[in-house]
Amino acid sequence: MSGPNGDPNISVEDGLINDDDDFGSEEYEAINSMLDQINSYLDDLEERNDSLNGKLHELMESNRQARLEFRAQLSNHTPQEDSADGESKEELGGDAGWENDKKIDEGS
C-alpha cells in the first residue's frame, strides 16, 4: 500500500503519521495575539496609505489649478509683450502641462 503522498509502503498504522496537535491552548492564544497585532499594523498601514493617497490627489489638483492659472496669465499677454520679454510660450512650458492635465483628468 502506498502512503498518503504516494510514498511506497507507508501506512497510517506504522506510526509515522501523527495527526494529533501538539499545540496547547497557550500556543493558540499566542498565535491569535500575534495575528491580531499583525492585523492592527496592517489596518494602520492601510489608513496611512489612504491618507497619503488623498493628500497626493489634493496636491495634484492644486498643481493643475496653478498651471491653469499660469496658462491663463500667459494667454492674457499680447504677442508684443512676449517678444519684448524675450520669452515665448514654448519656452515657458508650451502644451506639456496641458497634456499632463488631460492625463490626470482621464485617470491615467
Swiss-Prot record:
This is Bublin coiled-coil protein. The keyword Transcription does not apply. It comes from the Eukaryota. It comes from Takifugu rubripes. Belongs to the UPF0184 (EST00098) family. InterPro entries: BBLN_eukaryota. Essential for intermediate filament organization in intestinal cells, interacts with intermediate filament and regulates intestinal lumen morphology. It holds the Pfam family UPF0184. Its main location: other. It is found in: Cell junction; Cytoplasm, Cytoskeleton. Residues 25-73 form a coiled coil. One of its GO terms (cellular component) is cell junction. The gene is bbln.
